[in-house]
Amino acid sequence: MTFRTLPIRAAAVAAGLAVATPALAQNASFFVVHGIPGRDVAATADPLLPVDVLVAGKYCLLAGFTFGSVAGPFDVPAGSYSVAISLANPIAPCTNTAVITATATLTAGEFGSIVAAESTSGAPTAEIYPVDVTSIAAGKQRIITSHAADAPEVKVTAIGSNPKEKAEFKLQPGKQNESTVDTAQKFSISATPVGAKGTIGPITVEAGDRSDILVWAVGNAANGSVTLLSKVLPDVY
């Protein structure tokens, strides 16, 4: 699949990757999402499960990156990049053996998210989800929800400040939904496993007009760790 306040280290790495590109139009952009809680790995693991993210075999993009965090967006030249995720090494970041590897193919002008998550078999993996950055009309917002959890189909509900500002849909594992809604200053977003009791969330997301509201479902249903993460991409004109 193809797709598009940084820490000083990450900003420097992104700048290094961008050296070869003569024009921004040839770039792609992406977020990195940490969606694996430590308790899904081992009972004794750090709940935040800090990891390091190495790109292209030599750029340590993120060090000590913790569960629930969303980093970026990063702008890089279009192309294919290896991504290696390892348990964090605070002394020598990005030098531990990779526990997740993936290849991200970035096409010029595209935007996306690389999500460290659990597959439906429970194994750690890196999934790539596109982010729609086409123009949004005035008075509208776009909610883009990605099901990256080791969990069954869920019913997602997003309710704005006014009950008329609402989106509701079902989402299969590994799939994505895009809903355009009337602008609300604040949305309450929750998910319910289809055919099961209990609600995931809600989380509260604040966003301005013409914003992309990005939501990722991550975690493991069997361990009771499924949660919702979010990021706002403002001013999508």
Which ranges hold each PLM region?
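Bacterial N-terminal signal peptides that target proteins for export
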Residues: 2-11
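Intrinsically disordered, low-complexity polar regions and short flexible loop motifs
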Residues: 24-237
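Cleavable N-terminal signal peptides
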Residues: 12-13, 23
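...the same signal can extend to comparable exposed beta-sheet modules
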Residues: 1-2, 189
